[in-house]
A protein has these predicted regions:
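Positively charged, low-complexity intrinsically disordered leader regions
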Residues: 1-30
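General structural feature for long, well-ordered alpha-helical segments within catalytic domains
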Residues: 3, 93-96, 128
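N-terminal catalytic cores of NTP/NDP-binding nucleotidyl/phosphoryl-transfer enzymes
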Residues: 21-78
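Short acidic, glycine/serine/threonine-rich loops at helix termini
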Residues: 76-80, 127-132
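Short glycine-enriched, charge-decorated loop/helix-capping segments at active-site entrances
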Residues: 81-87
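A glycine-rich helix N-cap at a beta->alpha junction
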Residues: 88-110
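Conserved alpha/beta enzyme-core scaffolds, especially Rossmann-like or related mixed alpha/beta domains
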Residues: 105-126
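Conserved small/polar residues in nucleotide/adenosyl-binding loops
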Residues: 134-139
Length: 139
């Protein structure tokens, strides 16, 4: 069974955009990302499935990108809620992101040429996009 077939059989792949992705995954040539909003200072059991998938793909030679949502966490996400998520300060978000990184390093190899960790605050805050979204009315 190939890696892709295993992931599909376990229900970890719902769809793909191109069949070339199958070969990339099976041959350890895929670069992929999974996003994490840092609304708390600790990863949860819900994050564990994503980390397990990242680890499994990395062990097969693929390159994971852990995308920390430092910028998007500043906005909040009321999806499926009747109230807004508590707004966190930049300092709280930076602290949570640092905690996530320390915890993720137990599972994912962030060494040279391995996994990458990015924080979308690094580019979103420079665009002042966060300010626009923060001051825009909620639907």
């Amino acid at each position: 069974m190939t890696l892709y077939e295993e992931l599909k059989a376990r229900g970890l792949v719902a769809q793909i955009t191109d069949d070339e992705i199958i070969d990339l995954i099976n041959n350890g040539k895929a670069t992929f990302y999974i996003g994490f909003d840092c609304t708390a200072d600790s990863l949860t059991a819900g994050h564990f499935m994503a980390l397990t998938l990242m680890k499994r793909l990395q062990m097969a030679g693929n390159k994971p990108i852990a995308l920390i949502g430092g910028g998007t966490t500043m906005i909040g996400d009321p999806s499926g809620r009747t109230d807004m998520r508590k707004m966190l300060t930049k300092e709280d978000i930076d602290h949570n992101a640092a905690c996530f990184k320390r915890q993720m390093e137990r599972f994912i190899d962030f060494g040279e040429g391995k996994a990458i960790m990015l924080n979308n605050a690094d580019w979103l805050l420079k665009l002042n996009y966060v300010c626009l979204l923060y001051t825009s009315p909620s639907p």
